[in-house]
């Protein structure tokens, strides 16, 4: 149900993240469907998925909707759209390599996604380009997005208590956690029409963000980062600084 891709780049291979593949698919699918898109056309992504694909969708005039983590919530949106007729699902995806184009399923679909990735690679090849070139074109147009996920394992009763205490600490710090944060979204309070979930999202003025949540299936606390910058080098330096600070907080 998931699909990842590796693209030959010179003498090496580049492994794409789920966010990168998602952004490429969004651009390709919307380009192919541009004559059939309308004001109801909608892209759905999870709250911990990069804004890059969403920004591409916005440029094509799509509505953007977010769900909690888990593809079942994207499936729920499709059901809702079919019942109300107010929106039309075009594409949905999440950072963990799950994609769905069309309404034939209510879960991530690696079969159709793999077919589309092959078509997309052929489309770029016919232009004398690779998927790496396609991704770089997206960065040139929308800015560089550097996404990363850290998972911290905290086992046992003490670990569970520490996870709870960490979430309380992050919640209390609010915008003071880092310089430049202009908004903190606490999904445990019920945001928009989303179910309540123990997730905190910190958003910087430049559109960069960080999200913190306990794993629902393992003794882990997960930290998602999405850094936006004009250059890959600056994004990398900034990510390293933020990650080191978060590590010091969690490992204290």
Task: Label every model-predicted segment.
Residues 5-14, 32-213, 220-222, 231-236, ...:
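Phosphate-binding and adjacent anionic-ligand microenvironments
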Residues 226:
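Active-site beta-strand/loop architecture of penicillin-binding DD-peptidases
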Residues 17-29:
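Catalytic or ion-translocation cores adjacent to nucleophile or general acid/base/metal-coordination motifs
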Residues 1:
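Oxyanion-binding/catalytic loops of NTP- or PPi-dependent enzymes
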């Amino acid at each position: 149900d998931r699909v990842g891709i590796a693209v030959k780049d010179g003498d090496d291979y580049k492994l794409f993240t789920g966010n990168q593949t998602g952004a490429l698919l969004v651009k390709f699918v919307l380009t192919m469907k541009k004559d059939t898109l309308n004001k109801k056309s909608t892209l759905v992504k999870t709250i911990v998925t990069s804004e890059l694909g969403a920004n591409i969708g916005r440029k094509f005039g799509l509505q953007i909707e977010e769900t909690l983590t888990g593809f079942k919530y994207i499936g729920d949106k499709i059901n809702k759209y079919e019942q109300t007729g107010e929106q039309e699902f075009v594409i949905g995806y999440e950072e963990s390599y799950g994609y769905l184009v069309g309404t034939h399923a209510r879960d991530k679909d690696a079969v159709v996604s793999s077919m589309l990735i092959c078509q997309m690679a052929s489309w770029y090849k016919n232009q004398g380009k690779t998927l790496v070139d396609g991704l770089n074109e997206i960065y040139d147009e929308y800015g560089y997005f550097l996404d990363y996920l850290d998972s911290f394992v905290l086992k046992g009763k003490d670990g569970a208590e520490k996870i709870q205490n960490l979430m309380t600490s992050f919640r209390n710090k609010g915008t003071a956690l880092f310089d430049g944060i202009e908004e903190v979204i606490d999904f445990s309070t019920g945001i928009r029409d989303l179910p309540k979930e123990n997730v905190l999202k910190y958003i910087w003025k430049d559109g960069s963000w960080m999200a913190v949540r306990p794993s629902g299936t393992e003794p882990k606390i997960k930290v998602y980062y999405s850094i936006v910058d004009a250059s890959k080098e600056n994004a990398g330096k900034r990510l390293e600084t933020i990650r080191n600070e978060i590590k010091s907080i969690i490992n204290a």
